[in-house]
């Protein structure tokens, strides 16, 4: 059944929004895995755990925001299987933050691709929505993760475990 409110909302954009929803849910699932990995008794980095669990919640909320926009435009939400995280053991904070940065770069590229698709289909509502709710937030998160990686690398070396502990205590307790 077609929507009675649908106007200037191309099937390609609708499919790309559904794909982006899936990417956000996958990111949320990955961050949940990361968060609870760092919460384990043999890892015990509470600040790192909290950082990733907050990201899991933010990505789930972003998926819901996209789904709400999809409905408002007369599109249909088509749910896909959410791929499990690429691993269960994340190693050190450095490895986890590198994986998270790669994930965010992938999400950012998908957002940019959707924005370009919206522009190509002359969809100002979609472009405005992405600019106001996603693009700036994503750039800020990429910068924050890059800064965290720089600081983690500074603390790496012969006593990397101490550096990881200090990073967690001095940086993530204040996020």
UniProtKB/Swiss-Prot annotation:
Gene Ontology biological process: intracellular iron ion homeostasis; iron ion transport
Family annotation (InterPro entries): Ferritin (IPR001519), Ferritin-like (IPR012347), Ferritin-like_diiron (IPR009040), Ferritin-like_SF (IPR009078), Ferritin_CS (IPR014034), Ferritin_DPS_dom (IPR008331)
SUPFAM superfamilies in the cross-refs: Ferritin-like
Top-level taxon in the UniProt lineage: Eukaryota
Gene Ontology MF terms in the entry: ferric iron binding; ferrous iron binding; iron ion binding
Sequence positions that bind Fe cation: 54, 57-58, 61, 64
Keywords: Cytoplasm, Cytoplasmic vesicle, Iron, Iron storage, Lysosome, Metal-binding
Protein's UniProt keywords contain Metal-binding: yes
Pfam families: Ferritin (PF00210)
One GO cellular component term: autolysosome
Domain Ferritin-like diiron residue range list: 7-156
Main location: cytoplasm
Subcellular location per the Swiss-Prot or TrEMBL entry: Cytoplasmic vesicle, Autophagosome; Cytoplasm; Autolysosome
Known function: Stores iron in a soluble, non-toxic, readily available form. Important for iron homeostasis. Iron is taken up in the ferrous form and deposited as ferric hydroxides after oxidation. Also plays a role in delivery of iron to cells. Mediates iron uptake in capsule cells of the developing kidney. Delivery to lysosomes by the cargo receptor NCOA4 for autophagic degradation and release or iron.
Family under the similarity heading: Belongs to the ferritin family.
Quaternary structure annotation from Swiss-Prot or TrEMBL: Oligomer of 24 subunits. There are two types of subunits: L (light) chain and H (heavy) chain. The major chain can be light or heavy, depending on the species and tissue type. The functional molecule forms a roughly spherical shell with a diameter of 12 nm and contains a central cavity into which the insoluble mineral iron core is deposited. Interacts with NCOA4.
Protein name per UniProt: Ferritin light chain
